[in-house]
Regions:
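Structured soluble/peripheral alpha/beta segments that form catalytic or ligand/cofactor-binding pockets
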Residues: 1-341
Length: 341
């Protein structure tokens, strides 16, 4: 049985051991890096946003893994399938990105070489993203500002899980796949408008004390279908998800909890359709990739290999009240991330 946490708790007990594993509908788990026993080179802290309009998708990530890290910017044209990106490797970045302990305390301003990124948390759970990146691939420049707005009382999926037989390792992840987005991005020498009701955003926050090897699959999406805003977050990896899986579906900001979800990927061609099913037959979903982004980061004893795919989701979900919801053409992302220390 999964364990729902319904009030604020610490992830440590009185003597510093990990406790209170489970899942929550909000940021109830208190994380403090200063209390960790884990060596700094095994701690990962990251902040990630994916925003998209009917024509373009942009993904921004700040990633600090102790011995190495990166700043990643990816711009995808959903119409002609073109991609432009910037991947800035960071050696020993611990603390440089100044990522906060809590997801609701996000005020981050990062300037690396010629790029400037700002993530700002505002009142009512909204977010502001400011970007100025003049040297993306294909001589493209990306600059602009967008505001991510939330619905009143919108819920998030937050999971806190250990690794089996590794008492000091854990995975704490939050995903909010329901933002509406407004603003302008200047890309390919033309303005791209993000209009409320036609543009969306996904926020992911992660704090992880890693084992030596890990592999993690993830997918998330958001959009409007037949007058309802829907979104989801599904994923799994080598962490012990007995107390709470990452899998949840959202309708107008309300969370509907799922148990296990399986990713079915063609081993010969990852650009073929992906299929998703849940163990209790509540979810059946297909993903159609339109573009692929991959990168590898290696330094001394640590490596990170990531494969991302952007595209559209189709399927059906049985909600918590037993009603059946069909959805089509919802924009999102899938990913496989593998780490090795």
């Amino acid at each position: 049985m999964q364990t729902e946490i319904t009030a604020p708790v610490s992830i440590f007990d009185d003597v510093g051991r990990l406790c209170n594993f489970g899942w929550a509908r909000g940021p109830f788990f208190h994380y403090d890096r200063e209390l960790l026993w884990t060596p700094g080179r095994l701690i990962t802290e990251s902040e990630r946003y994916i925003i998209f309009s009917p024509t373009h998708l942009f993904a921004f990530e700040l990633y600090d893994a102790g011995a190495l890290g990166h700043i990643s910017i990816c711009a995808v044209s959903l119409l002609d399938k073109a991609i432009s990106r910037k991947f800035e490797k960071l050696s020993f970045p611990t603390g440089i990105l100044k990522l906060p302990n809590q997801s609701e305390e996000t005020i981050i301003k990062t300037a690396i070489n010629d790029s400037l990124i700002e993530f700002i948390c505002i009142e009512d759970g909204g977010r502001i993203i400011k970007i100025d990146a003049p040297q993306l691939s294909h001589n493209n420049r990306l600059r602009g500002e967008v505001v991510l707005m939330t619905q009143e009382d919108a819920q998030s999926i937050v999971t806190y899980a250990p690794w089996r037989r590794q008492t000091e390792r854990f995975q704490l992840i939050r995903c909010s796949p329901w933002y509406t987005t407004e603003g302008v991005m200047q890309f390919e020498n033309k303005p791209l408008l993000f209009n409320k009701g036609r543009a969306w955003g996904i926020y992911e926050w992660a704090r992880i004390a890693r084992p030596k090897k890990d592999i993690h699959y993830w997918a998330a999406a958001c959009g409007m279908y037949k007058g309802q805003q829907i979104g989801f977050n599904v994923g799994y990896g080598s962490a012990d998800s007995t107390a709470g899986t990452e899998n949840a579906f959202f309708v107008n900001g309300v969370l509907h909890k799922l148990d296990q979800v399986t990713f079915k990927i063609s081993p010969s061609n990852w650009l073929e359709p992906w299929h998703f099913t849940s163990n209790n037959n509540r979810l059946e979903m297909t993903f159609i990739p339109v573009q692929h982004n991959s990168y590898q980061n290696n330094f001394l004893f640590y490596s990170l290999r990531t494969r991302q795919f952007f595209g559209f989701f189709f399927g059906k979900i049985t909600l918590d009240d037993g009603s059946l919801l069909h959805f089509n053409n919802i924009t999102g992302i899938t990913e496989r991330r593998k780490t090795d220390n």
